[in-house]
UniProtKB/Swiss-Prot annotation:
Function: Probable core component of cullin-based SCF-like E3 ubiquitin-protein ligase complexes which mediate the ubiquitination and subsequent proteasomal degradation of target proteins. The E3 ubiquitin-protein ligase activity of the complex is dependent on the neddylation of the cullin subunit. Involved in ER-Golgi transport by regulating the size of COPII coats, thereby playing a key role in collagen export, which is required for embryonic stem (ES) cells division. May play a role in the regulation of mittotic entry via ubiquitination of aurka.
Native species: Xenopus tropicalis (Western clawed frog)
Family: Belongs to the cullin family.
Protein name: Cullin-3
UniProt GO molecular function: ubiquitin protein ligase binding
Coiled-coil stretches: none
Record keyword Nucleus present: yes
Stretches with biased composition (Basic and acidic residues): 682-698
Amino acid sequence: MSNLGKSTGSRKDTKMRIRAFPMTMDEKYVNSIWDLLKNAIQEIQRKNNSGLSFEELYRNAYTMVLHKHGEKLYTGLREVVTEHLINKVREDVLNSLNNNFLQTLNQAWNDHQTAMVMIRDILMYMDRVYVQQNNVENVYNLGLIIFRDQVVRYGCIRDHLRQTLLDMIARERKGEVVDRGAIRNACQMLMILGLEGRSVYEEDFEAPFLEMSAEFFQMESQKFLAENSASVYIKKVEARINEEIERVMHCLDKSTEEPIVKVVERELISKHMKTIVEMENSGLVHMLKNGKTEDLACMYKLFSRVPNGLKTMCECMSLYLREQGKALVSEEGEGKNPVDYIQGLLDLKSRFDRFLQESFSNDRLFKQTIAGDFEYFLNLNSRSPEYLSLFIDDKLKKGVKGLTEQEVESILDKAMVLFRFMQEKDVFERYYKQHLARRLLTNKSVSDDSEKNMISKLKTECGCQFTSKLEGMFRDMSISNTTMDEFRQHLQTTGVSLGGVDLTVRVLTTGYWPTQSATPKCNIPPAPRHAFEIFRRFYLAKHSGRQLTLQHHMGSADLNATFYGPVKKEDGSEVGVGGAQVTGSNTRKHILQVSTFQMTILMLFNNREKYTFEEIQQETDIPERELVRALQSLACGKPTQRVLTKEPKSKEIESGHMFTVNDQFTSKLHRVKIQTVAAKQGESDPERKETRQKVDDDRKHEIEAAIVRIMKSRKKMQHNVLVAEVTQQLKARFLPSPVVIKKRIEGLIEREYLARTPEDRKVYTYVA
């Protein structure tokens, strides 16, 4: 027992040891495994894989890699695959160069892919371990690289593949039917052979394809241009682009779409832009002239694809638009009707607005170009501000005649578009004031609402300073109505008589209304003069310290006129009268609507039958220019308005000419409006000169005010900076020239508002 105990005490604890898996294999055994795998790979390549055990093959490959023979396996695989592709596949493809080449190559490619998938599955462990550790291509990619280098990129195969694909596409472009599937398969193969890149596809197919396409389209463009009009050419280019996109979609890799479309655009559009837009009898100008909105839209769509395409279109459109605009605003022909002048511009704007909307997708570049062109030619004619005001005057006087309020509103909105293009807005304001005054004083406005609406548009555009005087005119009219009500009440209360004269006086604030600097003289006939004196006393009694000055050129009168002579036909027989009130056999009564000057002239003939021009001038004291205009209206106007006759019967009026009442005057209308000659043609040259002088005087003050405002704020400024700032501030009303600004600066220096700095005479300081 003691021995057992001793024995037990001396025994140590033991651990179970597992012997490591032997890391070395007999070379003979390794070779035998490799021979087995090599044979299997070759059988797979020959499509004889049905008798193979993939599990056994996988285990053998696993064993080789595990025992550090991965390199032998990998190298062996490369050699076996290379040998098969060189000796079998390449030979088959070479033998098919002239017979079913693409089909043979495609079949070889499909077989190779299938084989490589199977081989990859067998060698999966090598892919996971050896390939990863040694940073080499995986099994499948190795197969692709060998196929690429030994088959697809082998000398004549590579060239033949490229040429075959290019020939097929060239034939299809000419209308032949080709095997699109074969092209697609070849392109897909080239993309896969690039190993997630485009290099193989790009070098072996796409680059030569684009080069060939460029040559083809270059020749096609010459043919298209020689045989077709611009619109047909554009349609053919569109069709070509769509055809190329469709070909890419069905045959090539989708990445080729962008480059091939760029080639088409470059060869068929970019290189021929000017030729297309300038085509005689079919280019851009032809389309604009003939309102071809659809063709223009096609051109716009096509040209928007290429750099500078829209710019080229815009330049051509601009040349045509400026030519059209200059023809409309040219100063040729003094008798240009202002309403027609502006309507022509509005029609032109309407046409190009339609092109902008329907053809040019409201493109900003086209919009700016059209606006710039209108601004350019509208301001070529110095009469544009006056004519625009006369156009608005015509619409606000005659708006009801055949036009609804909405239509008038729409026309005024269009007129405002032209107003925005106008540089001399201050000139427009002066004329608008004159024409508004005439409408208000002769009760010719279509409605106060329309007038105020127009002023509101101007206010929105230019601010309240622009319209303050116009609004003041409306206030004066309202106050005058109240004053006249009070005056009539005063006459009733006092029993004072105006001697049969129905008098209406409008008291106008000098600063608001377009009064003339020197009021034209006129010897008002006694009856109306007496009536006015009664009003003057009444008004000044209420408003002491004020002055009333008659503005004869702004007044009007309704005269009761009686004509006694028989009315004769051309054959000399006498006729009855339709429109006039007839008393007795031949006496006719009319109400003549005339100006104050015309009234003064006509009332002379209550005293005598005949007057010479000099006599009328002496009696009335009307300035010669106004007198000639009034007499032309009365004696040389329309036959239905000639209440005076003149000897000799010429349109010119000279000192010795004799005037008498036209006793044969008749009209279908009881109330006859005597139009002032040339009133609708705008001002005469002397009047225009006077208006321009007034505008220039006003501008001097505005420029000086702007200079003082700026200098007061900045204290010190360099000349060019000040000129730029003044121009910026005033451009909403007019564009002052740098020369005029300089003169005004010098004027302010003389008057000691500004001073030059001693160190630099081109720098000014504000003198507080």
